[in-house]
Amino acid sequence: MKTRTIGSLTVSEIGLGCMNMSMGYGKADDAESERLLNSALDVGYTFLDTAQVYGSGHNEELIGKSLEGRRSEYVLATKCGLSREGINGDPAGIMKSCENSLQRLRTDVIDLYYLHRVDPNIPIEESTGALAKLVEQGKAVSYTHLTLPTTPYV
């Protein structure tokens, strides 16, 4: 499969968004999802995308369990700052979310860590400061943020 570059990361041209394995389209079968994840790596997918909010952590747990022993074969993207409780861009919340995601994913580093939503109550500099600190600590390779379509652009 052809590859693309995202910052310093080289990923398969087609990535696997994993949300549907834990939410959004009805109950998914974990055994079938595990087969899908492993088959995706077998055919050349190297970019997997998940988030703490997908299935309230279940999606990250599924990936961690299903692909244990294969971590060197894929680039892992996950997200923080959005949960069933709402948007939270608080630096302490971001740090805790990262620790929880690392445990669920059974890894010591997240390749691309997203702030899932910009918190209108927290200055973006504070949220991105926490993401930068995770990179400094070696818990993330890189970071970015997503925005809502209604977020004003300057």
Regions found by a protein language model. Give the residues of each.
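Active-site beta-loop-alpha junctions enriched in small/polar residues
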Residues: 19-21, 51-53, 79-83, 115-118, ...
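Hydrophobic faces of well-ordered beta-strands that scaffold small-molecule active sites
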Residues: 12-16, 76-78, 113, 143
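Active-site groove signature of glycoside hydrolases
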Residues: 103-120
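N-terminal binding-site loop/beta-alpha segment at the start of enzyme catalytic domains
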Residues: 1-74
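Conserved small/polar residues in nucleotide/adenosyl-binding loops
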Residues: 144-150
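Active-site-adjacent beta->alpha loops and helix N-cap segments on the catalytic face
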Residues: 122-125
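Short, acidic/polar
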Residues: 28-40, 90-103
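Generic structural signal for well-ordered alpha-helices
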Residues: 37, 60, 64, 98-102, ...
